[in-house]
From Swiss-Prot:
Protein's job: May be involved in transcriptional regulation.
Organism of derivation: Mus musculus
Region Disordered, residue ranges: 180-204
Protein name per Swiss-Prot or TrEMBL: Zinc finger protein 511
GO molecular function: DNA binding; zinc ion binding
PROSITE patterns, alphabetized: ZINC_FINGER_C2H2_1
Gene designation: Znf511
Lineage: Eukaryota, Metazoa, Chordata, Craniata, Vertebrata
């Protein structure tokens, strides 16, 4: 094996050993020290180049399918009753209690104890049934809000609102949002306030939830099916 003369000098310890070794370039390469021409390389689908990616994809899909097939287990606890006064629902899972509380007690009117499925419907109910200025303003401007929270439309009467919701939002024709509450027992401030309002036709009213019934003496076990 032939070594460059400068390397012999460095190995022998001669005076010129500290000088850097000369770099000799191939004259055929021109000014660039090397030649490189990019080109596309195509591998078949079953080539070993894709093996690692195929393994990772398989593990990812397997993990996703496992998560979808697994049904989350409910946190089972000893049976307990609803903590709201007058409610005798019995629960065996915390998820059932949370669903019940959200639907029945989460948006409850403080005047008449009616429960609504959303805060928007509760606000509309309080405005229309427990605001003494509502009927006065309704004679001058459109005050009946659309029950769809994302819809800004207002109407002159509740019947106009009902027609709008049936026609545009595809609500059922027999859909009812509210109706006069039947007085039971001593008169409440809300009942007295409702008595001072102008009488309205029951056919114009719409109802989402029925009037809360008196709690039965027996226990009722609550359950719901998760979607």
């Amino acid at each position: 094996m032939l070594l460059p003369p400068a390397l012999y000098s460095r190995l022998a310890g001669e005076p010129g050993a500290a000088e850097p070794l000369p770099v000799e370039r191939n004259p055929a390469a021109g000014e660039a020290p090397f030649r490189f021409a990019p080109r596309a390389v195509r591998f078949p689908r079953d080539h070993e180049f894709f093996e690692d990616g195929d393994v990772q994809r398989h593990l990812y899909l397997q993990d996703m399918l496992t998560q979808v097939s697994e049904t989350p287990e409910k946190s089972m606890v000893p049976e307990f009753t609803c903590q709201v006064a007058g409610c005798c629902q019995v629960f065996a899972a915390i998820e059932d209690y949370q669903h019940h509380y959200h639907m029945m007690h989460g948006n409850t009117c403080s005047f008449c104890n009616r429960a609504f499925p959303s805060g928007h419907l509760l606000d509309v109910h309080i405005l229309e049934w427990h605001d003494s200025l509502f009927q006065i303003l309704a004679q001058r401007q459109d005050m009946y809000q659309c029950l769809v929270e994302s819809c800004p439309e207002k109407f002159k009467t509740s019947q106009d609102r009902k027609d709008h919701m049936v026609r545009l939002h595809l609500y059922p024709a027999d859909f009812r949002f509210d109706k006069p509450k039947t007085n039971r027992g001593p008169a409440m401030p809300a009942a007295a306030d409702a008595a001072t309002r102008a009488p309205t036709d029951d056919s114009d009213a719409m109802e989402i939830c029925s009037e809360p019934a008196a709690p039965p003496p027996c226990r009722r076990t609550y359950s719901h099916r998760s979607v």
